[in-house]
């Protein structure tokens, strides 16, 4: 069932409730992430059940992800020196547009691949954020990974792939990217780590054992993503 993909939203919201509480005012960057996550959770099912994403639609989703990121962190970006502001703002926009657009175009039709991408992105972002000095954003990322694991596990047990679609893909990848950007702007995560994490969906798209049992596919594709996530964590380490 496509709505099973909302597990990542549930995991993220529960984590946020216990870490900082769910509030909407004052409108900080973290609370804007909350708003964007809820909006993505509403838009995803609409795309699956009422609309069919075309190439133009995917481009609009990618542009929306980039625009949402800049909206969430614009006040923080403006506080940086000019060169840093351009570098951080550009990295954030490019990373979010690419990872969300690529995942929706290339992975949304495969519940195992996109679940593995969200798992690796969530855990990788969470660990990188903790290394960079942000425990709260680290917990958000790990919660996202846990939600993605909850989406993958039933598929592995049943031996059948589940539908993911935009319901899972858009919020899962968007939240992972936003958490990474938050760790960059509000902690000490290097900008290039965000760009490396944006490649997790690409790694999961690489050829794999397509005819193997579902559980083995999940393991292999997750390992692909973990390699890239591990590189991002390793690059984050010297900056801590």
Task: Give names to the regions the model predicted.
Residues 62-185:
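Generic multipass alpha-helical transmembrane bundles of integral membrane proteins
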Residues 1-107, 205-240:
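N-terminal topogenic module of multi-pass integral membrane proteins
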Residues 138-145, 152-240:
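C-terminal transmembrane helix-loop-helix hairpin of multi-pass membrane proteins
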């Amino acid at each position: 069932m496509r709505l099973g993909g909302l597990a990542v939203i549930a995991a993220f919201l529960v984590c946020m409730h216990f870490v900082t509480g769910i509030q909407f005012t004052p409108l900080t960057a973290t609370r804007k992430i909350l708003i964007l996550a809820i909006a993505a959770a509403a838009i995803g099912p609409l795309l699956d059940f009422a609309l069919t994403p075309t190439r133009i639609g995917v481009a609009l989703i990618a542009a929306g992800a980039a625009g949402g990121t800049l909206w969430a962190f614009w006040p923080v970006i403006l506080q940086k020196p000019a060169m840093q502001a351009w570098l951080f703002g550009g990295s954030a926009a490019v990373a979010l547009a690419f990872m969300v657009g690529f995942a929706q175009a290339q992975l949304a039709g495969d519940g195992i691949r996109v679940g593995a991408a969200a798992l690796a992105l969530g855990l990788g972002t969470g660990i990188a954020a903790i290394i960079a000095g942000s425990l709260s954003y680290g917990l958000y990322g790990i919660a996202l990974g846990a939600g993605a694991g909850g989406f993958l596990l039933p598929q592995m047990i049943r031996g059948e792939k589940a539908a993911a679609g935009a319901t899972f893909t858009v919020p899962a990848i968007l939240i992972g990217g936003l958490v990474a950007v938050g760790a960059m702007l509000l902690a000490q995560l290097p900008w290039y780590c965000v760009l490396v994490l944006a490649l997790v969906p690409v790694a999961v798209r690489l050829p794999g054992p397509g005819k193997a049992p579902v559980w083995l596919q999940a393991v292999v594709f997750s390992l692909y993503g973990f390699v890239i996530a591990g590189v991002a964590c390793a690059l984050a380490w010297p900056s801590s």
